[in-house]
Amino acid sequence: MLIDTHCHLDFPDFEAERDDIIARAHASGVAQMVTISTRVRRLPELLKIAEKYPSVFCSVGTHPNNADEELDISADELVRLAESHDKIVAIGEAGLDYFYDTQKPEDQKTGLVRHIEAARRTKLPLVIHSRSADEDMAAILREESDKSAFPFILHCFSAGPDLAKTGVELGGYVSFSGILTFPKSQDIRDIAATVPLNRLLVETDAPYLAPKRWRGKRNEPSYVVNTAEVLAEVHGISFERMAEITTENAFRCFSKMTRV
């Protein structure tokens, strides 16, 4: 049994065959999925999916690459929305993305801090997107954690070892995607080996980043199996044991998510 802790089932890529995609996930041993918000205004679409499929849960938040679209969304509004539905089990994804020069860093930081406050108040995990922003992300995580702890996930981890270490030291989870399986990702596998077993999660980030076995294809939740296999190899344990560990970690992290 596995949990795909991060996918985007509301994206147009899946619209025509969502039933089949979720059926394939179940057939491959992926029991539950969390479909992640990239814009707060799309929450109704995510909830429609989560309400239709018992095994699908969702989050609420604004992706950093959309930060300027939703600067009016306050922490209070995020809290209100997060507490409005049983299927909303996380805040985000929010964070910092300096790879694409499309959003002002200050707008991204403002949004991130609001999402942190919402995670702190709701006790729901904040799904953090961090790309080419290791130093600023680590500094904000430390500063905000010094104020008061909050649960978080470093999603689709592809950063450096220092950010992984900071995340673990602050009590966060580190989630690995299909990037872990790429031949050129030995550095990410080396970092994954340093993350304690009780802090590991697996995800697809579908429809993006299909694992090596399906490279070049549209990603989907069933493919998280390949990522879990590689993560098991990295830690020198069986696939079955890694599946058990990451599933229990997912339920501990997403404490509002029920078992179905």
Locations of regions flagged by a protein language model:
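Mid-domain alpha/beta scaffold segments of enzyme catalytic cores
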Residues: 1-260
